Amino acid sequence: MAQGNEMHPRNPYRDKPPDFKALAIEYPEFRKFCQYVSNGKVTLDFRKDAAVRCLTQTLLKKDFSLNVNLPAGHLVPRVPQKLNYCLLIDDILQANSITSNVVGIDIGTGTSCIHALIGARHFGWKFVATDGDENSVQVAHENVARNEMGDSICVVHVNPAVKTVLMDVINSMPDSEFSFCMCNPPFFEKSDKEERFCEEPSLSNETYSNNFDFDMRSAPHSETIASSAELYVEGGEVAFVNRIIDDSVCLRDRIKFYTTMIGRKSSLKPLLQRLERFGENVKFLVHPLNQGKTKRWMLAWTFAKEMTLNTALKNSSISFQCPKPGLVKLMQEISRLGGRWSQEQPSVLVAEFKSVTWTNQRARRKANALLFENSAKRARWNTSSVACEAMMGNGDGKDSYTNSGNFVYSESFKTSDPAAVETSSQAYFPLPSGVTPRPIVKLRIQVDPDDKCDTLSFELISGAKQHLHQIVQYLKNLLCR
């Protein structure tokens, strides 16, 4: 059970993966799924759903003293990954000194109710755990009762046909204060589910497995058996998380911060773009969740101005040395590039840029020189006629689940000259009034002085990694020459 280096530093599975041999000796039920290999080690066949289910039950029993029923035909949670998720949430709670009366909402708790059970047992949190499937709610109720945690966890059935995810739960508890919400949404759209999974004939209807012949891609490392509702939702996970974002816009700080797991990296871009449209009114972060050979992400955001979204997992930094005084030169260059900076600490700057000004410097200098050149000496280019009309409008501030609220329109017209084409292009992207556009890149820069030189360390706060590398290379070329 290989673990990733990006697991939380407080996760015990990071440095000490489960010992299958010790577990097999202690738990006879788990022993049935183990086998010895030639080097004397004990292995587990992860391609068997029953073996993975038994491993999860055994780890919950040994490490958390939880007796959990995981019925066949439903998703089997991976304990290291779920603990990782809870630890990241705990980091945010600790960073904001929220250590008592912590109440969370687990959206789509499933039959295992694992988020709530681990959160309540390991961290002492209280939970409202919701699910739209009546059978899942019943099994989750039984798991909570079996572990005598009814005082800490309330399992609630919600109407799956209702588009809102959080509104009904919050409105039914007007006097309650919620610290966070968490969610593991269905990853796939229906077409993806039909491509990746087939019906499992040995179980009930609407149960699917990824254990079938693969022609176009390699077989999965472990078997996944799940109900239809656990696998797909209309619009996939992007649409589902957008529904949570919609509710968060209305609820604001009724929930201090919002989180969700993301299963597909391609889903991050549209969701981050959606959050960026709220400008400086929202803070958000993304952190990886590693478990074995599977990678997931946690997306967290908040509308509360006093909240910080810090975790124990730090972004990697890039460093270089430059002649003294590095801090003074750095501030001058950031300002010259049109960026803004502020001192977080005496030797730490936070810099942000709202446009890319550090690339194509030679072309920029040449263009500026042409502007001030004598018009009589300027090169004469072939005549062309270009018309451009730009209108920046204010929308109603409400985003749709898709891009249907925006439009881009382009039309071409023939002219009397057969070699020329006249083109008209229009674009409209509604921007909520009063919203300040978010910078395209934000960096934290630490200056460590030495006797002869200064060391500058750059850490990406938000934006694209390529912008971080471009800025660092530009400043290195400039400050070190």
UniProtKB/Swiss-Prot annotation:
InterPro entries: METTL16/PsiM, METTL16/RlmF, SAM-dependent_MTases_sf. RNA N6-methyltransferase that methylates adenosine residues at the N(6) position of a subset of RNAs and is involved in S-adenosyl-L-methionine homeostasis by regulating splicing of S-adenosylmethionine synthase transcripts (sams-3, sams-4 and sams-5). Able to N6-methylate a subset of mRNAs containing the 5'UACAGAAAC-3' nonamer sequence. GO terms for cellular component: nucleus. Signal peptide: none annotated. Belongs to the methyltransferase superfamily. METTL16/RlmF family. The keyword Transcription does not apply. GO terms for molecular function: mRNA m(6)A methyltransferase activity; U6 snRNA (adenine-(43)-N(6))-methyltransferase activity. Transmembrane segments: none annotated. It is found in: Nucleus. The gene is mett-10. This is U6 small nuclear RNA (adenine-(43)-N(6))-methyltransferase. GO terms for biological process: cell division; meiotic cell cycle; rRNA base methylation. S-adenosyl-L-methionine binds at K82, G108, D131, T164, N184. The keyword Cell cycle applies. The lineage of its organism: Eukaryota, Metazoa, Ecdysozoa, Nematoda, Chromadorea. Self-associates. Interacts with dlc-1; the interaction is direct, and is required for nuclear localization of mett-10. Its EC number is 2.1.1.346, 2.1.1.348. Pfam families: Methyltransf_10 (PF05971). Keywords: Cell cycle, Cell division, Meiosis, Methyltransferase, Mitosis, Nucleus, S-adenosyl-L-methionine, Transferase. It catalyses: an adenosine in mRNA + S-adenosyl-L-methionine = an N(6)-methyladenosine in mRNA + S-adenosyl-L-homocysteine + H(+); adenosine in U6 snRNA + S-adenosyl-L-methionine = N(6)-methyladenosine in U6 snRNA + S-adenosyl-L-homocysteine + H(+).
